[in-house]
A protein has these predicted regions:
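Acidic/His-rich, divalent-metal-binding segments that scaffold phosphate/diphosphate chemistry
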Residues: 63-193, 197-212, 302, 410-411, ...
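Histidine/acidic-rich helix-loop-helix segments that form or flank divalent-metal centers
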Residues: 163, 204-246, 260-264, 270-390, ...
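Membrane-cytosol interface segments
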Residues: 1-98, 366-444
């Protein structure tokens, strides 16, 4: 697939990055828009050829005309899963409890029926190994959830494949965006969200691709409460498969962000998941909670008793920041709500705000009693206090997404009255200044 003539498509750029170490050859004649052969089959693909092809409109997308000499095929994929199970303690505990070997083998065989997917997953492995590993985890977790829900074998293998390929649209995003190390701007965050639609578009061109998988790829960032994207769909509008993939993806994102560096088990996810039970449909939520609770996870402390006073001081400062941001953001949304246009971004904003509001009310972390409980610093409460670090990180992340959404509405002048746009600008500036002024006050 090429962009405008004269420019290398993002996916083709990935191919040019890997072709020196991982040979690619032309499997069928490449023809221009008029049907004339411009590159015969059998030739090796390289940067010079890619640049030459970029000057032409092709009859078939380039990805349909090439073959990677070393593919992550069904057999290789199964080997990679075995390696993950042997080396990752959390997945090993899951695997020992749920015995998914037979279903896993069938699922890998199903994946092997789609040559273009094998090509793209191979490129993902070489170009974005961290994302490829996440794809393995997401596929495995999705399969476990489907099994827990008593899905039949055909449904299970489809859920597995959707979990494996849910992020292939990222291969077609601008490389500068994908490789960015620091935080996305609101505009870049919005551009990244298009990977769901790109992924679904790719799958629609693949023969015999089950429609349920295409729908799941499109919906895996939608949320049951309407706070997701790309269409802010909610409730019964959403398919179960997309909810399963979304739940697995969320668990792995939370684990990578908040738990992996602390070497905690998946059981540490439970307090975070229970903050937002309405994000996913009830049966999917209960399935993942059941999967986690059925495993005897080893209990682990993060800090020594002697260091807990500093931990509590740091948490109290974090709590203060959450209270401040919530007050500003909630006040902003209440103020602009009657004037919001009727579109998907406005629906997302309302639903996300409501979710955060209920989350904070349910958790009780803004209550005086919560802070007094922390200040009491009873040794028997230390383990629970430690886990607040994870809960606070999730709440702060959710509020950061809300800030980005408000920034998009402001920068795109979605509000007709200039005073309302000024209110958003002022509120976002106020939050930024608060955190800038309090950096030095943090206790390490």
């Amino acid at each position: 697939m090429l962009n405008d003539v004269g420019h290398l498509d993002c996916y083709v750029q990935h191919l040019t990055q890997i072709c020196a170490e991982h040979p690619i050859h032309i499997e069928v004649d490449i023809c221009n828009g008029q049907g004339a052969v411009i590159v015969p089959k059998g030739r090796h693909f390289d940067l010079a050829l890619a640049e030459r092809l970029s000057e032409h409109t092709l009859q078939e997308p380039l990805e349909n005309c090439i073959q990677l000499d070393e593919l992550v095929d069904a057999q290789k994929l199964m080997q990679l899963f075995k390696a993950v199970i042997e080396t990752d303690q959390n997945i090993a505990l899951f695997h020992e409890r749920w015995q998914l070997n037979s279903l896993l083998a069938k699922s890998c065989e199903f994946y092997g029926q789609f040559p273009l997917l094998m090509q793209k997953m191979t490129v993902l492995k070489y170009e974005m190994p961290h994302l490829f590993k996440q794809a393995l985890f997401c596929a495995y977790t999705s399969l476990a959830i489907a099994r827990r829900l008593k899905a039949n074998r055909d449904e299970c293998v489809c859920v597995f494949l959707a979990g494996l390929i849910h992020d292939i649209g990222i291969l077609h995003l601008d490389l500068e965006l994908v490789t960015k190390k620091d935080e996305y701007t609101p505009e870049q965050w919005q551009a990244m969200q298009s990977h769901t639609q790109l992924g679904a578009k790719i799958l629609k061109r693949i023969p015999n691709m089950p429609p349920s998988i295409i729908k799941a790829i499109l919906e895996h960032h939608e949320r049951y409460d309407g706070s997701g994207y790309p269409r802010a769909k909610k409730g019964m509008e959403l398919g179960t498969m997309g909810q399963i993939i979304g739940m697995a993806d969320t668990c792995l994102a939370l684990y990578k962000r908040d738990l992996h560096s602390k070497k905690l088990g998946f059981d540490a996810l439970l307090p975070i998941l229970q903050l937002n039970p309405g994000i996913y449909c009830d049966k999917v939520f209960k399935a993942i909670v059941g999967l986690i609770k059925d495993i005897p996870w080893p209990m682990k402390r993060l800090y020594s008793d002697e260091s807990m006073p500093k931990v509590v001081s740091r948490l109290l400062l974090t709590n203060e920041g959450i209270t401040h941001d919530y007050s500003v953001l909630y006040g902003l949304v209440v103020s602009i709500n009657p004037h919001l246009p009727k579109n998907k971004k406005s629906a997302m904003l309302r639903n996300m705000t409501q979710r955060i509001h209920f989350c904070l009310q349910r958790s009780g972390i803004l209550q005086r009693e919560h802070k007094e409980w922390m200040r009491a610093q009873k040794k028997e409460d230390y383990a629970a206090i430690e886990r607040l670090e994870i809960m606070y990180a999730e709440i702060r992340w959710q509020m950061k997404q809300l800030r980005k959404l408000l920034a998009i509405l402001w920068k795109k002048h979605q509000l007709k009255h200039p005073q309302l746009n000024q209110e958003i600008q002022k509120g976002l500036w106020q939050i930024e200044q608060y955190h800038r002024n309090h950096i030095g006050a943090k206790v390490h």
